[in-house]
Amino acid sequence: MAEDKRLGRDYEYNGMRGTPYIMRRRILLSPSGMPCTPPPFGTLVAVDLKTGKRLWEVPLGAFTRLLPAEQAAKVRPEWGSPNLGGPIVTAGGVVFIGAALDRWLHAYDIETGRELWRGPLPESGKATPMSYQVPSGEQFVAIAVGGGGAWGAGDYVVAFRLKSE
């Protein structure tokens, strides 16, 4: 870590071999707090691996909580959210992902992309969830959330018990 004396903040710097330069990793946002690319800012896409065909695509998350109220009111749900993490798919055909900035673990039907459920998270899910089964037969989905970084969040591991059918 190195301190940026102008801004009074610490940043992670990485040296670049063979050059006298260093790199500062950060998320590039506009002065209003919006990403510097046109929407959508995040989507979840299902692809048929045999044909390469896109089966469905849905907006993933929302990031209105990071914006001033006036700006957040202009954000549309279909824009999605920047995200950090990936999905898992259960044997029952449910896709779980919590990578967006909206503080939800989402569950989608793998065939249609329809959202089946969402569970609240104390911070943004910035990891890929995992699924496990305990000796009693109950199945859980867990995800690490938070992790500091550019959005200054806490650290948690959250688990949800899945309903048996």
Located regions from the model:
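Beta-sheet-rich non-transmembrane sensory/scaffold domains
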Residues: 1-165
